[in-house]
């Protein structure tokens, strides 16, 4: 993935433009509107399938306690399918960069094996809130591009965690991550400038308001944003280029 321009990353596909996020339909819409990359989440089912899904449960049942067949029956009844990670990879191949978020620890090797079976390292990223997952990925293959996610909803260590997100140098060094992806509320106190000094591109999540997109992309000049509305973000960039011209 070359960061030779600001990246518009479709959050769970173009999730704001379709009925069901993290589906092939959402991925198709992301490509249709011109997104540079697709972010998706993965979890593991009871029978060992790695699937594309954000929440830890579906209709009150934990993903880890359901087989993929069980899940497929439930989701089909609601008019969609949760793709496997391999299906998502194959769909994205030769179309768009896939940005995979590990929602849990413990199956990093399986994810890497699946991705590298079909893609070269330039065609995917792996992101996580878990420092240990990122460290493990780099031990397996230092050429894989990793993204340190920052801005957990419920910080495990309270204020200490928040400070480590606002001033993440130690975590950046420990994980050897290639990029940093903070929640937009963390982007303050010269955040982007500090990360640029450490040569770490900043990919901000989840930016859905056009004014906030403009602030991040134009004013703060971040390397990219993750958004449910990639079409709006692309328009913001184009309108800025026109005004400069």
Predicted regions span which residues?
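Phosphate-group recognition and catalysis centered on beta-loop-alpha active-site segments
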Residues: 1-245
């Amino acid at each position: 993935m070359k960061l030779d321009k600001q990246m518009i990353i479709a959050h769970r596909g173009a999730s704001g433009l379709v009925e069901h996020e993290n589906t092939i339909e959402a991925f198709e819409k992301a490509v249709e509107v011109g997104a540079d990359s697709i972010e998706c989440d993965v979890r593991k089912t009871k029978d060992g399938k790695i699937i594309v899904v954000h929440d830890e449960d579906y209709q009150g049942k934990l993903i880890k306690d359901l087989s993929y067949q069980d899940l497929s029956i439930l989701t089909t009844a609601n008019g969609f399918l949760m793709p496997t990670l391999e299906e998502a990879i194959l769909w994205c191949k030769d179309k768009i960069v896939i940005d995979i978020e590990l929602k849990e620890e413990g199956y990093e090797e399986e994810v890497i094996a699946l991705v590298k079976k079909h893609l070269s390292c330039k065609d995917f990223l792996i992101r996580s809130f878990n420092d240990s997952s990122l460290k493990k990925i780099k031990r397996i293959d230092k050429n894989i591009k990793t993204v340190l996610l920052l801005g957990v909803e419920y910080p495990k260590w309270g204020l200490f965690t928040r400070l480590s997100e606002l001033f993440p140098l130690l975590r950046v060094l420990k994980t050897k991550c290639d990029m940093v992806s903070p929640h937009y509320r963390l982007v303050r106190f010269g955040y982007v400038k500090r990360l640029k000094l450490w040569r770490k591109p900043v990919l901000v999540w989840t930016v859905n308001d056009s004014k906030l997109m403009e602030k991040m992309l134009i004013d703060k000049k971040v390397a990219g944003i993750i958004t449910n509305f990639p079409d709006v973000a692309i328009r913001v960039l184009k309108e800025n280029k026109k005004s400069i011209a």
